[in-house]
Amino acid sequence: MKKSISLLLLSLLMITPSCQKPKEAANEYNIVPKPNQIIPREGRFELSNKVRLVVPPDAPEVKDIADSLAGRLKLTAGITLKEADSADGKQAICFVMEKGMPKEGYKLSVTSNLITVTASQPNGFFYGVQTLFQLLPTAIYGKQLDKKVDWSVPAVEIEDAP
């Protein structure tokens, strides 16, 4: 009888964890605060001196934000982004205006060939670039050149808004 009760209790203990709801996926990208949506993709965007920087014309505040990204990459990675009017199928970081998005909202899309930061307002571009910084190696926050780092970004789709 004791064996039967022990066996029954052991069976119940083994079944109980399988009945629990699955836990929310961890924020594998260590982005703080956690964005509303993170969709992992395959591949990485490799940063180099061949990467183009595409910013909408007549958007000086967005250009300032793009320049802050370019300046940080120059300082810490020794990478100089080439300003261009379009990506033209080349590796590029593109800033795209999209009307109708929330003021501080943004979309960040990273593929092996293209990084796109989409927003409707400068605030959204700012937060998109802050998220991009968090996807880069921590050396991006440094004050000196670090050539030993793998300067690449994991492919991902991120969307966030307050």
What do the PLM-derived regions correspond to, one by one?
Residues 1-28:
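Bacterial Sec-dependent N-terminal signal peptides
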Residues 20-162:
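Contiguous, structured surface segment used for ligand recognition
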